[in-house]
UniProtKB/Swiss-Prot annotation:
Belongs to the ETS family. Induction: Up-regulated by salicylamine. Residues 131-162 are annotated as: Disordered. This is ETS domain-containing protein ets-7.
Length: 218
């Protein structure tokens, strides 16, 4: 029967295991840094460290001789080296675990990244706000604030919004109101030159683009 070979990944776990022990003060009587600046450490009780490694991997027969053979794997790839002597000293040379982890989280004082001007999410969020404002404008108590509730305007005339020139009874459906505002926002952000044309021409363009918003027009 052939002996079970340890995979490179299993050996890499051994290296991580040792680093974990070094960072845990409760095991400082077993393994400790002899010079942390140079990443040199010493196993004060190497056989006990091997027993812990065996318990972690489900191998009760693990001993220091077997574990040290696993450590030799790292000598060949310049990841670990044995310090001369018989006091179980080793030195990390290059290990991914020792490399700093990238910071995926923005700092608190960093400015937030600007969202592109035109996006479906932005249009939907903006149209939901406008739909809510439209509902408030329909009540008698809020009629005096209707001029300030509209979010998009091309001119300062009373019919300055595409939503104003579309037959109001048709736009009782919130979905139609939302679609009208999305279209108006699209025109304002993607076709700003269209804002220079009279409102009736803008309305005609909208009728052609979205005829479902004008069910009463043939």
């Amino acid at each position: 029967m052939s002996s079970k070979r340890t995979s490179p990944n299993g050996k890499q776990r051994l290296l991580n295991f040792l680093r974990g022990l070094l960072e845990d003060d409760s095991h400082s009587d077993l393994i400790t840094w002899s010079n942390k600046d140079t990443l040199e450490f010493q196993m004060l009780k190497p056989h006990k460290v091997a027993e812990l490694w065996g318990a972690a991997t489900g191998n009760p027969g693990m001993n220091y001789d077997k574990m040290s053979r696993g450590l030799r794997y790292f000598y060949t790839n310049n990841t670990l080296k044995k310090v001369k002597g018989k006091d179980s000293r080793y030195c990390f040379l290059d290990t991914p675990l020792l490399a700093p982890f990238p910071d995926f989280f923005p700092k608190a004082n960093e400015p937030m990244r600007r969202v592109p001007l035109f996006s479906i999410e932005n249009l939907l969020a903006s149209s939901e706000e406008t739909t809510s404002n439209f509902s408030l404008q329909s009540s008698p108590s809020s009629s005096s604030n209707s001029s300030s509730a509209r979010t998009m305007s091309a001119t300062s005339s009373p019919t300055s919004s595409l939503e104003d020139v579309i037959n109001p009874p048709v736009l009782i459906d919130p979905f139609q109101m939302q679609m009208a505002h999305i279209t108006q926002t699209f025109l304002a952000t993607q076709l700003p030159a269209l804002q220079a044309f009279p409102m009736q021409l803008q309305l005609q363009f909208l009728k052609t683009l979205l005829p479902t918003l004008f069910p009463n027009n043939n």
